[in-house]
């Protein structure tokens, strides 16, 4: 089967890995790839793209070039560097899995780390618990400040506080929960 090993985080610059088990037009079944988008989860996306490329008859060099030139869409894992700040914009149609993946990416960043999170919508009847679980997950990360805005996002703040209160080795994230959103904008603006 197709698998990856030698997975190395390049921080906010992406991830490199070796892919095995696909047959390219130049007869390579093992080669190195670098995904220029951060997050371990992006390895799976790159592997799927490489597999599709091999089925379409691409060479390992063409697959490598395609993966290396990956561009994200607005609101999906965009890294914005401006005025000495680095922003990870992953707000489009957020869900618990994507939010946790973004927190993993933020956890790898160097310097002071601030997560600004809003409510996730269309999650169904367990939406409050899902937000709370994201907060508990955030509590396991090396994140300095959490700022939330929105009714459901308050559950993220509650989950983070609960994790910190019950785990003596928790990082100690500073938690701020705002409602309405305008109060938050005044705080960070």
Range-by-range predicted roles:
Residues 1-30, 73-74:
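Extended acidic/charged loop-beta regions that coordinate divalent cations
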């Amino acid at each position: 089967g197709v698998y990856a090993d030698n997975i190395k985080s390049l921080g906010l610059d992406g991830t490199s890995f070796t892919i095995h088990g696909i047959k390219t037009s130049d007869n390579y079944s093992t080669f190195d790839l670098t995904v220029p988008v951060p997050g371990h989860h992006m390895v799976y996306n790159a592997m799927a793209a490489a597999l599709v490329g091999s089925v379409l008859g691409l060479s390992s060099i063409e697959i490598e070039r395609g993966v290396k030139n990956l561009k994200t869409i607005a609101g999906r894992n965009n890294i914005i560097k401006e005025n000495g700040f680095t922003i990870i914009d992953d707000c489009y149609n957020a869900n618990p899995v994507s939010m946790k993946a973004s927190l993993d990416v933020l956890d790898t960043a160097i310097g002071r780390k601030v997560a600004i999170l809003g409510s996730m919508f269309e999650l169904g009847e367990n939406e409050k618990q899902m937000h709370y679980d994201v907060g508990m997950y955030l509590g396991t990360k090396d994140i300095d400040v959490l700022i939330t805005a929105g009714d459901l996002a308050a559950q993220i703040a509650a989950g983070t506080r609960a994790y910190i209160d019950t785990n003596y080795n928790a990082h100690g994230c500073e938690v701020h929960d705002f409602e309405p959103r305008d109060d938050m904008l005044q705080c960070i603006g």
